[in-house]
Curated annotation (Swiss-Prot):
Belongs to the DapA family. Homotetramer; dimer of dimers. The lineage of its organism: Bacteria, Pseudomonadati, Pseudomonadota, Alphaproteobacteria, Rickettsiales. It is found in: Cytoplasm. This is 4-hydroxy-tetrahydrodipicolinate synthase. The record marks T45, Y108 as: Part of a proton relay during catalysis. CDD domains: DHDPS (cd00950). GO terms for molecular function: 4-hydroxy-tetrahydrodipicolinate synthase activity. It holds the Pfam family DHDPS. The active site is at Y134, K162.
Length: 301
């Protein structure tokens, strides 16, 4: 498996009573597929995995796989700060038919680099599913070294890394990682720079809201149309900034509610977007013409 393209870090729809909205989720996945993305990543940070119980987690993963029906890749979030729990989740997504498991660096415990390596090795050795390493120090409080990333990447079924430390690191990782390992940007604002430094794709938050735009950025870079790509990148950066104006994924869910994709509901300890945040999100969506495009699409159905 060689990962490339745009993968959406999928938001999880909730009803007004905060139960899972399975119908909205299936519809949302279909829309993502029709918009041209390469894959979806359910049950990650944007999917509020921290507030899903295990039954809900399993439901989301199964529904995404069933809805995708092999049309795109499904890389299911399976990470935890507990190695045995991570193994249990990875075994579940393997049995459910996911294409790969996204495994975050253990958070809260703050292990050493050797502890991080042993965590990934234990998960790898207990499963048979391809693994994508997720390095996000702003949430885990650990930024593992390039050497440790290389050691993890040498495990046979590690096929990618989602790195959220900036585009500058991509070239250094490209030089030391095996060819089988895709480097995926975890930062929409620097996705183009990541591609230009040798990155293979992006696991994107903004593609929840603007999947076609995120795919277009990837396509333009692949075609060598860098000036046009820079224009699209500027628009995506503006959208990305407003989608993190308050704790994520509250701004993303509000944007999707304006587009008729899901309710803006999030689970505590997250709260819905403030009125000032709502105004900021709506202004950017209108500036980028995303609301009009969505209304036009619905009018054609």
């Amino acid at each position: 498996m060689k990962l490339s393209g745009v993968f959406t870090a999928l938001a999880t729809p909730f009803r007004d009573d905060l139960s899972l909205d399975e119908r909205a989720l299936a519809s949302f996945v279909d829309w993502q597929i029709s918009s041209g993305i390469s894959g979806i990543v359910p049950c990650g940070t944007t999917g509020e995995s921290a507030t899903l119980n295990f039954e809900e987690y399993c439901t989301v993963v199964r529904l995404c796989i069933e809805t995708a029906r092999g049309r795109i890749l499904v890389i299911a979030g399976a990470g935890s700060h507990c190695t045995t729990e991570t193994i249990s989740r990875a075994l579940f997504v393997q049995s459910a038919g996911a294409d790969a498991a996204l495994i975050v660096v253990p958070y809260y415990n703050r292990p050493s680099d050797e502890g991080v390596y042993q965590h990934f090795r234990a998960v790898h050795d207990a499963t048979n599913i391809p693994i994508v390493l997720y390095n996000v120090p702003q949430r885990t409080a650990i930024d593992i070294s390039n050497d440790t990333i290389r050691r993890i990447a040498e495990l046979p079924r590690v096929v990618g890394i989602k790195d959220c430390t900036g585009a500058e690191r991509v070239a250094a990782l490209k030089a030391i990682l095996p060819e089988k390992v895709a480097i995926l940007s975890g930062e929409d604002e620097t996705a183009l720079a990541s591609y230009m430094n040798g990155g293979s794709g992006c696991i994107s938050v903004v593609s929840n809201v603007a999947p076609k735009m995120a795919v277009e950025l990837y396509r333009l870079h692949a075609l060598g149309k860098i000036n046009m790509a820079k224009q699209v990148s500027g628009n995506l950066a503006a959208l990305s900034r407003v989608l993190f104006i308050e704790p994520s994924p509250s701004p993303t869910k509000y944007a999707l509610s304006l587009m008729g994709k899901m309710r803006p509901k999030v689970r505590l300890p997250l709260v819905e977007l403030t009125s000032s945040g709502q105004t900021a999100v709506k202004n950017v969506l209108e500036t980028l013409d995303l609301l009009r495009q969505q209304k036009a699409m619905h009018s054609q159905l």
